[in-house]
Structures are given as structure tokens and as C-alpha cells.
């Protein structure tokens, strides 16, 4: 019988190893990521900062399985995200990853509640009670039946966050999550991000906002596609 090492370190919620990403435009080649490696533990919040064009959005897309790195590997909760079919990446993302975009990715013909439930259906673990609790905690329970076009900017942001959190993801990725929000909505979003880390999710924030970066346990700076600190 194989023995188990009780002292073995747990698998990081996110493990990205030696990521490279090239983009081609005619004869020109741009190296967007240069050997980026990043490990984020469960319950840890990491802020990724850097100037425009430094590779932050490309890195987030690769971590989410929305883009495929040309080199290196991404694992989420021990499951490979890279070198998989598009369908397999979508399956891993649905079950283990929440992505909060600066512009909420909502389906217009569905209500707010139906958008959140649809996210759960992708992961095949519908929990309507959790949906209602989540909408209540985000202060939009009274807008559950509204369509995205009927929401204010702050309500749209919170609905997008509800979709990202629908499946209690092991990894939450947020791209400028407070970028265009009023102070009250931004505070509510930050509160929820902290709560997810307290729950045990690994949280990665891509931001230019120093105040948002300050809530992170660790700050990683990208420059020309490489980590500089």
C-alpha cells in the first residue's frame, strides 16, 4: 500500500508555470508574456499591477482559460487548464473559476437571477437558495427579475459579481473590478472580494487602483510581460 505523506504541502489553488504568449500581426511578433510563473494559495489575495500593455489582461485571460499560452502550464485546484480542448477548459472554468470583468458579461434576454442560475447550470450544480442569498448580500435581491438593460451601472457590476461567484469558485479573477464604480458600489464589491478570500478562494486582482491593491496579501508587478517584483 502506498503511504501518504501527511506533511506534504497542499496544491496551490492557482499554479501558473513559465507562461509565454506570442501575438502575430503580419510579419510582426509581440511577446505578451515572458516566462511568467505565479502560485496563489487558497485564501490568498494577489494584486497584479503594471502599466498599460504590460501583459496584465493577457495573463488574466490565460489564467481563466479564455486564452491559451504558447508555452507553460496553468493548473487550477490541481486540474490542468492549459493544453486542453476548448470544451475541457470551459468545463474547468465553469466548476473552479469565477471571472469578474470590468464590463459585466450578462445575457440580455435573461433576468439577473436567471443569469446567475445559468452560470451554475454550466457547472451542473444549481443551488437556487445560494443564488437568492448571493443577490441579497450584494444588495440586488429586489432586482432579481430585471433584465441587464434595466439595471444601473452599480447594479450591473453587482450582477456580474454574482455570476462570477455563483459556483463558489476555487479561483476568482477580477479585472479592474472597481474601475468605473461609485464609491458605495466599489466598497460593496471590495467587501465581497474579501469575503471570498475568507471563504478560502484564491483571488487575483488586475488593477491600476492603489487602494484596491492595498487589500491584497501580495502585489506582483508586470513589465513588458515579465514579473519584476
Where are the language model's segments positioned?
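Catalytic Walker B motif of ABC-type/P-loop ATPase nucleotide-binding domains
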Residues: 172-175
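Helix-to-loop junction immediately C-terminal to a conserved catalytic motif
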Residues: 64
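ABC ATPase NBD coupling module
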Residues: 27-30, 81-98, 198
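Conserved ABC ATPase signature
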Residues: 147-151, 155
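Short coil-to-helix segment of the ABC ATPase nucleotide-binding domain corresponding to the Q-loop/switch region
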Residues: 110-118
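Conserved ABC transporter NBD signature motif
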Residues: 72-80
Amino acid at each position: 500500500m502506498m503511504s501518504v505523506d501527511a506533511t506534504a504541502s497542499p496544491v496551490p489553488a492557482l499554479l501558473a508555470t513559465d507562461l509565454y504568449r506570442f501575438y502575430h500581426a503580419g510579419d510582426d511578433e509581440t511577446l505578451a508574456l515572458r516566462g511568467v510563473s505565479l502560485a496563489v494559495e487558497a485564501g490568498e489575495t494577489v494584486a497584479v499591477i503594471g502599466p498599460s500593455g504590460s501583459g496584465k489582461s493577457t495573463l488574466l485571460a490565460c489564467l481563466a482559460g479564455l486564452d491559451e499560452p504558447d508555452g507553460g502550464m496553468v493548473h487550477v485546484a490541481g486540474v490542468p487548464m492549459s493544453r486542453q480542448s476548448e470544451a475541457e477548459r470551459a468545463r474547468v472554468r465553469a466548476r473552479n473559476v469565477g471571472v469578474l470583468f470590468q464590463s459585466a458579461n450578462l445575457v440580455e434576454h435573461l433576468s439577473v437571477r436567471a443569469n446567475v442560475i445559468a452560470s451554475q447550470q454550466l457547472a451542473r450544480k444549481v443551488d437556487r437558495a445560494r443564488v437568492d442569498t448571493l443577490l441579497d448580500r450584494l444588495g440586488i435581491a429586489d432586482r432579481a427579475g430585471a433584465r441587464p438593460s434595466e439595471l444601473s451601472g452599480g447594479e450591473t457590476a453587482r450582477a456580474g459579481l454574482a455570476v462570477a461567484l455563483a459556483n463558489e469558485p476555487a479561483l476568482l479573477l477580477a479585472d479592474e473590478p472597481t474601475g468605473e464604480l461609485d464609491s458605495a458600489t466599489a466598497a460593496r464589491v471590495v467587501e465581497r472580494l474579501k469575503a471570498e478570500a475568507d471563504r478560502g478562494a484564491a483571488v487575483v486582482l488586475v488593477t491600476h487602483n492603489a487602494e484596491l491593491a492595498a487589500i491584497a496579501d501580495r502585489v506582483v508587478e508586470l513589465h513588458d510581460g515579465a514579473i519584476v517584483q
